[in-house]
Curated annotation (Swiss-Prot):
Gene3D superfamilies in alphabetical order: N-(1-d-carboxylethyl)-l-norvaline Dehydrogenase, domain 2, NAD(P)-binding Rossmann-like Domain
GO MF terms held by the record: 3-hydroxybutyryl-CoA dehydrogenase activity; NAD+ binding
Biological process annotations from GO: butyrate metabolic process; fatty acid beta-oxidation
Keyword annotations: Fatty acid metabolism, Lipid metabolism, NADP, Oxidoreductase
Stored NCBIfam families: PRK05808.1, PRK07819.1
Upper classification of the organism: Bacteria, Bacillati, Bacillota, Clostridia, Thermoanaerobacterales
Record's catalysed reaction(s): (3S)-3-hydroxybutanoyl-CoA + NADP(+) = acetoacetyl-CoA + NADPH + H(+)
Marked site positions, Important for catalytic activity: 138
Entry protein name: 3-hydroxybutyryl-CoA dehydrogenase
The family this protein is said to belong to: Belongs to the 3-hydroxyacyl-CoA dehydrogenase family.
EC number(s) from the headed UniProt entry: 1.1.1.157
Pathway(s) this gene product operates in, as recorded in its UniProt entry: Lipid metabolism; butanoate metabolism
Length: 281
């Protein structure tokens, strides 16, 4: 397995492309518009330059890594890939459409993975004629730094597919954990309701955003507070995951807080928009 195709050049897609390229894989980075591909390349270049400045890699190594990544807007280019990982937005209809097209384009032996943070792998796989070769490969943000990968089996995912993806995660210096499909998987089922609760505490006026985050950092030994983490993940992404949990389980503990909804409606999405629970310059 030498050639990887990453669908989506946003925050997650560009990070995934970087990690594979750093570990010797040829990468096709695809998005619907060249401006998104170029933005993804810019993010990768900036990340690698930071590593050069810190003395972790040389300028030549940086250029070598970048040379392994090829940008495209043509989904047909995925036919060259031995492995595809999709990192589009968290929208089931969109993901199913992408997987339907990939199923028609890609070689029959190609494994199709989704970086979804909460959606059903079984449902995504239903759009294909190869459900045994569809799997979840959930990376965490920032991808080049975070070690964990949740490897999620759908109802029909084969053991062989799981083993290949688990080995692939190890090859890119990640720690894979095996997850049976369930809404939110492991990390987000625990983490996102905690963030939602912190938003509720803020909305109730119990404490300021700064003090809520300080409390969790010093009182629970968290490296980052829940509200700053929500800003980092993207408040729109947090809301999308809460909606999935609430729709799937129907349990009020997963109901997204009205303040979170209001912030997303108002475009206060966190770091990517410069303002969320905190301001960013």
């Amino acid at each position: 397995m030498q050639k990887i195709c990453v669908i989506g050049a946003g925050t997650m897609g560009s990070g995934i492309a970087q990690v594979f390229a750093q570990n010797g894989f040829e990468v096709i980075l695809r998005d619907i518009d060249m401006k998104f591909v170029e933005k993804g390349f810019g993010t990768i270049e900036k990340n690698l330059q930071r590593n050069v400045d810190k003395g972790k890699i040389t300028a030549d190594e940086k250029n070598e890594i970048l040379s392994r990544i090829r940008g495209t807007t043509n989904l047909e280019d995925a036919k060259e890939a031995d492995f595809v990982v999709e990192a589009a937005i968290e929208n089931m209809d969109l993901k199913k459409q992408i997987f339907k097209e990939l199923d028609e384009i890609c070689k029959m032996e190609t494994i199709l993975a989704s970086n979804t943070s909460s959606l059903s792998i079984t449902e995504i796989a239903s759009a294909t004629k190869r459900p045994e070769k569809v799997i979840g490969m959930h990376f965490f943000n920032p991808v080049p730094v975070m070690k964990l990968v949740e490897v999620i089996k759908g109802l029909k995912t084969s053991e062989q597919t799981f083993n290949v993806v688990r080995e692939l995660a190890l090859k890119v210096d990640k720690t894979p954990i095996e997850v049976k499909e369930a809404p939110g998987f492991v990390v987000n089922r625990i983490l996102i309701p905690m963030i939602n609760e912190a938003i509720g505490i803020l909305a109730d006026g119990v404490a300021t955003a700064e003090d809520i985050d300080e409390a969790m950092k010093l009182g629970a030994n968290h490296p980052i507070g829940p509200l700053a983490l929500s800003d980092l993940i993207g408040n729109d992404v947090v809301l999308a995951i809460m909606n999935v949990l609430y729709e799937e389980y129907g349990d009020s503990k997963y109901r997204p807080h009205p303040l979170l909804k209001k912030m997303v409606r108002g475009g206060l999405l966190g770091r990517k928009t410069g303002k969320g629970f905190f301001e960013y310059k």
